[in-house]
UniProtKB/Swiss-Prot annotation:
Residues 736-752 have a biased composition (Basic residues). The keyword Nucleotide-binding applies. The gene is ifkC. Residues 572-639 have a biased composition (Acidic residues). It comes from Dictyostelium discoideum. Residues 697-735, 850-875, 1135-1158, 1230-1240, 1509-1531 have a biased composition (Low complexity). InterPro entries: aa-tRNA-synth_II/BPL/LPL, Anticodon-bd_dom_sf, CC_SR_Kinase, Gcn2, HisRS-like_core, HisRS-related_dom, Kinase-like_dom_sf, Prot_kinase_dom. This is Probable serine/threonine-protein kinase ifkC. Keywords: ATP-binding, Kinase, Nucleotide-binding, Serine/threonine-protein kinase, Transferase.
Length: 1700
């Protein structure tokens, strides 16, 4: 209900009008006075006075309303400008009369305008705006004379009482402003009111209490935090002062402490050396002389614990180790502390020696357990270890590694991993050497090592070197073992055979699979802790997994393992020590902290240096000093270990396979063949040899790895320093601080080798396991580089074959979007069959990301290219030196500048970030320039930075160099450098090369062109004439010749193979899926189509058929498929009549081909053009099991045309054969004379009878011209599917054709049928127009524009025809830019195609153009001026442009007589697309007036030329037969003087079959009608059943009457009623359930769509029947006997509701 103040506001506007003004009163007095003067006694009546007053009042009101309207419009514009988006217009309303207004006599109010304004208070921020309203105002017609309608609606926050109060206030204010503009003032008043009441909405008391508590708690916490910060600041200031003071004090004592520590270390080292010397002598004496001492007892305890642990399971190992510790502790109580430590060291030292000996023996398969036991006995006699320890040398014991792990867990840098001994056990040689040979080799190696090192060969010396290096070696060995709980997939599945190659990235090993026994190549790559580098490494795996080609190395699988076990590839040569420095024992033995006890304590104390005591500091200093003294012994032991390993590994002379020799037969995916960094492109430094370059690549890659490791440590060091400083401030421990400072300074004075080894040691400690990537690939025995170096002793054809294989492989790689970037002979391999395999995709990248490499990708690229790319030694070394200086100077700077605190750390971090950015930039630049010397293109040298991006043409440049090396052999390496440099820079070939290999030289020049755009792609190279033909191509051609010959004996075998079911299962799932999910566009073909689709199709077809029946059209069906006549159609428009068919059918199995020996179809205008249209949309070609090609019809009109042509060809053959018999009869009569008159008369009688039944072609055409054939057809046409295995696309189409008449009336009738059809359809009537043009006018247009090329015509016409949907400037842009047409030519096109309108309007424009253009006003024939149409006698176009316009005028007259609206036919000259489909005359389209301008139908004249000339035949046999016939005819004419011209002209003349027709896309029509019908259905159904989901989806017809029953046992009654109705001709239906529920029957009756529902009810013994009319909503009671009579008398029409 509206508020009461609103009613009050309407009262002023409803007051009676004011009295008339004085002018009106004077007018009334004048009227009265004039009446008195004229009439004398006559007085005016009351009616005249009232009428005069009414007129005056009306004129006054109209003038007033006009003035007020202008004033209202001005106010509305001002308000809209002021409030902008807050002003919204509304529809005005009329307040009708109610009881109150009728009683008071107030007239209804009519508003002229109504609007709404959003009012907010005067608040700047929306967050503080808590209230807002909508002020709705309505202007009466007499506003502002009367009050406006004002209404206040709450938008936000304002209570309803306040809104009523504001509305009353505004009404009161408006009463005082009558006659003036007031809305803006009212808005200001409303804003003031809202500003006063702009309060935050009130909430509950609990919420207010909670919010208040939160505010108080926030304030309290803020105060506490401020106090805590203040206290912390004071404490920091106090600690800073104390620390500064202590720092200065410690600095004064620094020099003294330094000297004391040196003296202390020297003294301790001397004492320890003397003690060790005495202790070792004692041990030797005890073991050699045989006295049993406490030490032996202790040793027996150890042996017991070890043996016990060996016999038990793995779970008892901890107990064994605990027993060992307990026994150890018990024995130590009887001795001094120093002796107990030494005894423990001796026991562990002996165990370590045994472990090292066992590991060394595992690498030699010729060593047996007997050999090891003999060697152990000799070592026992020397006193190296106890006899009870010999059990640890058992190579088949798998539990020993766990014992070593428990004993040496304090000395190992990483946890022990188990080594798989089962693999090595299988490789033991049964025919081993004798023990003497093995033992002599062992001791000879030891003697040689001691001689080289200058030491004595005493047992004490060997024992001491084992002590010094044992820890290091043991640690190194521990790195190469695997956890017993982790099974190595690599060692369990594969057996290593040979190392094929090694690079900076990893190794490639030849292995044998233990399961299948085949050989493979496995690439082992060590992964980095940096995830970005790992992603770069894994890029090769991803690339290989995408490639599957016969000339690309096959990829099998890849996996990652956490570590790598010992194998022949792990003990590398000297040049690989730097590559795997973290795994080599030599690199660890170089470290000074290699002793077991000292190394452990130093590592523990260095991690807890801030919390350690002064005593631990002294111990650490002692041990570090000892490490410096023992460094020489460690190096000595390292040399011994290396020499010993080489003897064991390379005893058979196979050490050469592990070297980086580039001249051997090694196979490497990471071959460093002439690797280089293009930024340092120095050829003189690369001449030294391949081995030197390869070694440099490995060393530089090592430097890059060291640089990355150091950078990672440098990132973590500031954080560690910061945490250390915080601990110092809290603990205030100046001693630990001074200790750290002294420690850092002592470390900075160590040599560079020691600092590098210590950094390696830290990296090893941090990483518990290092993952390896294994890539299993195809094993190839040879590489192309071996052949190019020694010379390819092959025939020229074989070299071309190999080159073609390389090109095919690169074409496939480039087709996958991959750039190899490192194509060279070392990366091209041969398989076992001698075919090419392209490999090493370590540098391959995606072609799309070449020009936009991210910094991360560039960094990764630099890492991945280490295998085939040598970096700049100067640049890399400078970066490494900078990093080392930073690591050395950073601790000093930190402790010297510790006063500056956090500021110094921030500066260091900023410097580190800047250096890292510079390093990334350098790496990005270097990475972009990847490749191999002499094989990189100029754009590769320039890199990818900036605008010089490269693509797959860089591989083609490399291919050119490779191709040159395949034809030319270099005598020396120096010659190779000079020749390749001249070839790259100057394009100069060696002498006699270009003369002997001219084709090769041309091809090489193309490939190494400096402009990438001029280089051919791999696909273009395969198709080039410079490439010799492929042998496989010749095989294919020969096979095609065989299988296309039906007389060949293998022809039927080939067909049986093609039609076998071996491959049908590959496409069966696609076929069945399409059958089940994608229904055909022909709705009648769908078994489960919905109800409305079937109804719409039936109704539309009935409407069209009704219209066609009125035009006397009959249904004539054409075959859906036919024998194909042209497989590859070559558009040959306007051929000469004498020319034969371009292509003919390859088989002669049909009767049609046999019977058309003298009658062929001339491939002239329409046939070729129609075939071209078919080619564009795609024909559906099928083949039967006999090899016959069949074509599914593409268009109903084309099918009808082919059908007519075939019928007339058969007619011509029949007519010719008939007259041939007549000629024979006449010939017989002339020879026999008149001997038998009776027989002659009978024969003439038969001839006359045959003449009456046989007609010629021209006679039939003459009859059809008077009464043409009108036919229609509803059918389906097919299009070629887009995917293999799918069904051809099926479309519904309707066509109407008029055959036999050349008159324009047939064209007009076709368009008349078109308009009647679309006018009868509700979805298209008044929403379409006919787009008309003439074929002859289009041809004149092309002649006027100056375009003669047929292809260009079709392309331009396709663009120009889009003017109905696109503006001219868009079409003009395409013509200028895409087709490159001159501007004048485009302007000429515009003068034609922009002309459209009704037929009279366009004719006026064309007449004017004809007068101004001599080309159009001439009388020349179009056919004579058009070369493409010079002999087309069948074209029915006029000879001049004037005649063409007369045709259009005549057509317009026909339209007028047929009552076709002139506005429905648009003469559009831009409609020129598909004009080649039509041969002559009119062509038109039916276009919807909607935005998309969709085409629903096309039509026009497509006459078919028919040539019955027997001189042109499709086969030689027919030509010979026809020539014989001609000779016989000529002889007959000459001999008998018979006039044969009549008969010869009957079939020696070209005929024209006139056809005009219409094709309608029924799918589009069905869709539109279905949508409209569905809307009507939803309106008819109740709201509860109006949804599509509740409608019947699987029913084929709609009943008119539906019978239901309410009660049991009425099923038979329902069936009886349905039967009676059906017998009477009504469509009745019921449910097929005997006793359904009433609800089910009610739903079924409604959803069925029936017009009438019969309900049967049973009340006692009586049965009542009610008939309900759904449309009229009426029910009638009908008896059982009168049901049929009821529907008969009701004039029931079953389809009245469905008429369209």
């Amino acid at each position: 209900m509206p508020p009461k103040p609103k009613q009050k506001a309407k009262q002023p506007s409803q007051q009676p009008p004011p009295p008339p003004p004085p002018a009106a009163a004077q007018l009334i007095e004048d009227i009265l006075s004039s009446d008195e003067e004229e009439g004398g006694v006559k007085l005016p009546t009351k009616s005249s006075v009232k009428n005069a007053l009414k007129k005056v009042k009306k004129e006054r009101d109209r003038e007033l309303i006009r003035q007020l309207k202008d004033q209202q419009d001005m106010e509305l514009e001002a308000l809209q400008a002021i409030f902008n988006d807050e002003f919204i217009t509304m529809d005005p309303i009329i307040i009708n009369r109610n009881m109150d207004t009728i009683i008071e006599g107030i007239k209804p109010i009519r508003e002229s305008a109504r609007f709404r304004i959003t009012i907010k208070p005067y608040v700047g921020d929306d967050e503080k705006c808590f209230v807002s309203i909508y002020l709705v105002v309505g202007f009466p017609e007499k506003y502002p004379v009367v009050l406006p309608s004002i209404q206040v609606l709450v938008n936000k926050g304002l209570p309803q009482k306040k809104a009523i109060e504001l509305e009353e206030k505004l009404i009161r204010e408006s009463q005082g402003k009558i006659g003036n503009i007031m809305i803006f003032d009212l808005c200001e008043i409303a804003k003031d009111f809202l500003n006063e009441n702009n309060f935050e909405p009130t909430q509950s008391i609990h919420h207010d209490f909670r919010s208040h508590q939160q505010k108080i708690s926030i304030e309290i916490s803020t105060n506490e935090q401020q106090q805590q910060q203040l206290q912390q600041l004071q404490q920091l200031q106090l600690q800073y002062n104390n620390d500064t003071k202590k720092e200065w004090e410690s600095t004064l004592e620094e020099s003294q402490l330094k000297e004391d520590r040196k003296n202390y270390r020297l003294q301790k080292s001397i004492q320890r050396a003397q003690y060790e010397k005495e202790r070792k002598k004692t041990i030797v004496n005890e073991f050699t002389n045989g006295p049993q001492s406490k030490l032996s007892k202790q040793q027996r305890n150890i042996d017991y614990s070890i043996d016990h642990s060996i016999n038990n399971n793995n779970n008892n190992n901890n107990n064994a180790f605990n027993n060992f510790n307990n026994n150890n502790n018990n024995n130590n109580t009887n001795n001094s502390n120093v002796s107990s430590i030494d005894n423990k060291t001796i026991d562990k030292q002996q165990t370590m020696i045994l472990h090292l000996l066992r590991l060394l023996c595992q690498n030699d398969s010729n060593i047996t357990n007997d050999h090891i036991k003999t060697l152990g006995e000799q070592l026992v006699q020397m006193g190296i270890f106890n006899r009870n320890h010999l059990s640890l040398l058992n190579m088949h014991n798998s539990n020993d590694n766990q014992i070593y792990q428990h004993i040496f867990q304090d000395y190992f840098l990483k946890q022990f991993n188990d080594i798989s001994l089962s693999d090595l056990k299988n490789n033991v040689d049964s025919a081993a050497n004798n023990s003497g040979h093995f033992l002599n080799k062992f001791w000879d190696t030891l003697n040689k090592t001691n001689e080289n090192s200058g030491l004595k060969k005493s047992p004490s010396t060997f024992e001491y070197s084992g002590e010094g290096g044992g820890g290091g070696v043991g640690g190194g060995s521990s790195q190469k073992t695997i956890n017993p709980h982790q099974q190595s997939r690599y060692h369990s599945d594969f057996e290593e055979i040979q190392l094929l190659g090694r690079g900076g990235f990893g190794q490639v090993v030849k292995v044998r699979n233990k399961l299948d026994g085949r050989y493979y190549a496995i690439k082992k790559i060590k992964l980095d802790s940096n995830q970005s580098l790992n992603r770069r490494i894994l890029r090769e795996v991803i690339t290989l997994s995408r490639l599957h080609h016969q000339h690309v190395v096959r990829y099998y699988q890849a996996w990652i393992e956490s570590a790598e076990s010992l194998s022949l590839t792990n003990d590398n040569s000297d040049d690989d020590d730097d590559d795997d420095d973290e795994f080599e024992s030599g690199s660890e033995s170089e470290e000074s902290q290699s002793e077991s006890e000292s190394e452990s304590s130093e590592s523990e104390e260095s991690s807890e240096s801030e919390e350690s005591s002064e005593s631990s500091e002294s111990e650490e200093s002692e041990e570090s000093e000892y490490s410096d003294d023992s460094e020489f012994e460690s190096e000595e032991n390292n040399d011994f270990d290396q020499s010993f390993s080489e003897v064991f590994l390379f005893q058979n002379g196979n050490k050469r396979s592990l070297e980086f020799d580039l001249t051997d037969d090694s196979y490497s995916f990471l071959h460093s063949d002439c690797g280089f960094l293009l930024e340092v492109f120095d050829l003189n430094n690369k001449i030294g040899g391949n081995n030197t370059r390869s070694m440099g690549s490995s060393n530089q890659h090592l430097q890059q790895q060291q640089q990355q490791n150091q950078s990672q440590q440098q990132k973590k060091q500031p954080q560690q320093n910061q945490s250390q400083q915080q601990k110092k401030l809290k603990n205030s421990n100046s001693k630990s601080k001074s200790k750290s400072k002294s420690k850092s300074k002592s470390k900075s004075k160590s040599n560079s080798k020691k600092s590098i080894s210590s950094s390696k040691l830290k990296n090893i400690k941090k990483s518990t396991s290092i993952p390896y990537l294994y890539i299993q690939m195809e094993y190839c025995q040879k590489i192309l580089r071996n052949l190019t170096e020694t010379g390819m002793n092959l025939e020229d054809d074989d070299i071309w074959k190999l080159f073609r294989q390389i090109v095919e492989g690169m074409a496939y790689v480039h087709g996958q979007g991959i750039i190899h970037r490192d194509l060279k002979p070392s990366n091209i391999f041969f398989d076992s069959c001698g075919d090419i395999k392209i490999g090493d995709f370590g540098l391959a990248i995606n072609n799309k990301t070449t020009s936009t490499l991210s910094p991360t990708t560039n960094i990764n690229s630099s890492t991945s290219s280490a295998g085939s790319l040598t970096t700049s030694s100067n640049s890399v070394q400078s970066v490494i030196n900078t990093k080392q200086q930073q690591q050395q100077q950073q601790p000093q700077n930190y402790w010297e500048d510790e006063v500056e605190g956090q500021q110094q750390q921030q500066q260091q971090q900023q410097q580190q970030q800047q250096q890292q950015q510079q390093q990334q930039q350098q790496q990005q630049q270097h990475t972009a320039r990847v490749g191999t010397l002499f094989y990189t293109s100029p754009e590769q040298e320039a890199g990818t930075n900036g605008d010089s991006a490269y693509d797959d043409k860089v591989d083609m440049y490399s291919l050119g160099i490779v191709f040159f090396e395949m034809w030319y052999v270099f005598s020396t390496g120096h010659e190779r450098v000079i020749v390749l440099r001249n070839l790259r820079e100057k394009f100069e070939f060696p002498s006699d090369f270009e003369r002997n290999h001219s084709r090769q030289a041309t091809l090489i020049r193309m490939l190494i062109d400096k402009d990438p755009a001029k280089r051919p792609s791999a696909q273009q190279l395969l198709q080039s004439e410079l490439m010799p033909p492929k042998m496989e191509d010749e095989y294919i051609k020969n096979s095609i010749r065989v299988i296309t010959n039906p007389t060949n004996q293998f022809y039927q075998t080939m067909l049986n193979s093609l039609f076998s079911q071996n491959h049908q299962h590959l496409h069966s799932h696609i076929y069945h899926h399409q059958q089940s999910s994608v229904t055909s566009s022909s709705y009648s073909k769908s078994l489960f189509c919905s109800l409305d689709l079937l109804q719409v199709k039936q109704l539309v077809d009935d409407v069209i058929i009704t219209i066609l029946k009125k035009h006397n059209a009959n249904e004539m069906l054409t075959p859906q498929m036919s024998i194909i006549k042209e497989w590859n159609e070559q558009p040959n428009l306007f051929n000469n009549s004498s020319s034969s068919s371009s292509t003919t059918t390859t088989t002669s199995t049909t009767n049609t081909a046999n019977n058309t020996n003298s009658v062929v179809i001339n491939k002239s205008t329409s046939t070729s053009n129609i075939n071209k249209v078919s080619n564009k949309t795609g024909k559906s070609i099928l083949m039967d099991d006999s090899g016959q090609l069949l074509e599914l019809r593409h268009d109903l009109r084309v099918s009808f045309k082919s059908f007519i042509e075939t019928e007339f060809l058969n007619l011509g053959d029949h007519y010719k054969h008939h007259h041939q018999q007549q000629n024979d009869v006449r010939h017989d009569n002339s020879s026999n004379g008149n001997s038998n008159n009776n027989n002659s008369n009978d024969r003439h009688h038969d001839q006359d009878k045959s003449n009456t039944t046989t007609r010629s072609v021209d006679e039939i055409l003459e009859l059809l011209s008077k009464a043409p054939i009108k036919r229609y057809e509803f059918g389906h046409v097919f299009r070629k599917p887009h995917l293999v295995g799918k069904l051809p696309k099926e479309l519904s189409q309707f066509c109407f054709d008029v055959f036999g008449s050349s008159s324009l009336y047939s064209d007009a009738e076709t368009i008349k049928v078109t308009t009647e059809i679309f006018d009868s359809l509700p979805s298209t009537q008044n929403f379409y127009f006919v787009r008309l043009n003439h074929f002859g006018i289009v041809e004149y247009m092309w002649k006027f524009i100056g375009i003669t090329d047929l292809t260009l015509k079709n392309e331009i016409s396709q663009v120009v025809s889009q003017l109905i949907r696109q503006p001219w400037f868009t079409v003009k842009k395409v013509l200028l830019e895409k087709f490159k047409l001159p501007l004048k030519q485009v302007e000429r096109i515009a003068n034609w195609v922009l002309v459209k309108g009704t037929i009279p309007d366009v004719l006026k424009k064309l007449d004017a153009s004809q007068n101004n253009n001599p080309l159009l006003s001439g009388n020349g024939s179009l056919g004579n001026n058009n070369n493409n149409n010079n002999n087309n006698n069948n074209v029915r176009i006029s000879s001049s442009f004037t005649d063409l316009l007369e045709d259009i005028r005549q057509l317009a007259v026909y339209f007028e007589k047929m009552s076709i609206s002139p506005h429905k036919v648009i003469f559009d000259l831009s409609y020129c697309f598909s004009e080649n489909f039509y041969s002559t005359g009119i062509m038109f389209q039916v276009i919807l007036k909607e935005e998309k301008h969709e085409c629903l139908a096309v039509g026009g004249r497509y006459d078919s030329p028919l040539n019955l000339n027997n001189s042109n035949n499709s086969s030689s046999s027919s030509s010979s037969s026809s020539s014989n016939n001609n000779n016989s005819y000529n002889n007959y004419n000459n001999n008998n003087n018979y006039n044969y011209n009549y008969y010869s002209n009957c079939y020696l003349t070209n005929f024209n079959l006139p056809i005009t027709g219409l094709s309608v896309a029924m799918d589009k029509v069905y869709s539109r009608e279905r949508e409209l019908y569905s809307q009507k259905r939803r309106q008819q159904l109740p709201p509860t059943l109006s949804s599509e989901s509740q409608m019947i989806a699987h029913k084929f017809s709609t009943p008119d009457i539906f019978v239901i029953s309410l009660g049991p046992n009425l099923f038979l009654e329902r069936i009886g009623i349905v039967g009676d109705l059906c017998n009477a001709g009504f469509n009745a239906e019921t449910m097929y359930i005997e006793n359904p529920t009433p609800e089910e029957q009610q739903d079924a009756s409604i959803t069925s769509g029936a017009l009438y529902i019969i309900t049967i009810k049973e009340k006692g013994a009586k049965k009542t029947i009610k008939v309900k009319n759904i449309e009229k909503r009426r029910e009638d009671d009908v008896s059982r006997d009168e049901i049929v009579k009821f529907f008969t008398l009701s004039n029931f029409n079953s389809k009245s509701r469905l008429n369209i």
